[in-house]
């Protein structure tokens, strides 16, 4: 059964370590009982970087619980749940199955898959594993963002009723391969650009990819980047 394992929210906090200092809301805690979901997500959930997080196309962040075992095994880590700032930890479905536009009915809410999560250096920093964000990106199992089509209530243990939302099926895993793969697939990118439910920010990134414009992900993956030494600082 596809279901919600946990619901989480968090506040903005200062983090310092490994030569880095930043604000983050990655440290989320379990929300017990029934949780109200608005068009903006969970009322008591906050984002430190409101340029890259939050907003109607990123109302909630979803991550598959099954991926934790793979990450811990591959990188020899022991991780708390949640570890990556997700709002919904789910079981029974993952990024290889969830597609852009898919509709998720959870509790009394109606949610829609809008785009993959794009991992950043803060995930690596707080867990003391420099390779973590890049590992997410390379595997393609990044988790995804949801928009709220109909506000309502949900809670841990709720079953997820999952329906296809677009005639053309492109999974979160496939989108990540398009974004980060060495080869450009113009046909698949054009199929994605035709989807009505694709998030505008993802649409813009895909157009750059199609045009052959190189997107420098080093700052996102490693933080401040020193061009003279070509190392993150």
Q: Which role fits each region the language model picked out?
A:
Residues 92-94, 140, 150:
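Short loop/turn positions at the edges of beta-strands in beta-sheet-rich folds
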């Amino acid at each position: 059964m596809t279901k919600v394992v946990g619901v989480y929210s968090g506040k903005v906090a200062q983090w310092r370590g490994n030569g880095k200092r930043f604000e983050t809301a990655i440290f989320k805690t379990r929300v017990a009982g029934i949780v109200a979901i608005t068009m903006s997500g969970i009322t008591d959930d906050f984002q430190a970087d409101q340029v890259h997080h939050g907003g109607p196309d990123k109302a909630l962040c979803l991550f598959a619980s099954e991926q934790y075992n793979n990450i811990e095994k591959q990188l020899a880590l022991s991780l708390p749940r949640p570890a990556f700032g997700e709002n919904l930890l789910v079981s029974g479905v993952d990024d290889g199955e969830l597609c852009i536009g898919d509709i998720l009915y959870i509790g009394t809410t109606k949610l829609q898959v809008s785009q993959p999560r794009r991992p950043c250096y803060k995930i690596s920093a707080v867990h003391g594993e420099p390779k973590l964000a890049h590992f997410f990106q390379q595997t393609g199992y990044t988790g995804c963002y949801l928009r709220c089509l109909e506000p309502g209530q949900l809670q841990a243990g709720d079953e997820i009723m999952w329906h296809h939302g677009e005639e053309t099926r492109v999974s979160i895993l496939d989108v990540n391969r398009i974004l980060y793969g060495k080869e450009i697939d113009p046909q698949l990118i054009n199929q994605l650009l035709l989807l009505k439910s694709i998030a505008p920010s993802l649409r813009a990134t895909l157009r750059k990819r199609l045009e052959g414009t190189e997107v420098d992900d080093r700052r996102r993956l490693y933080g401040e980047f020193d061009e003279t030494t070509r190392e993150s600082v």
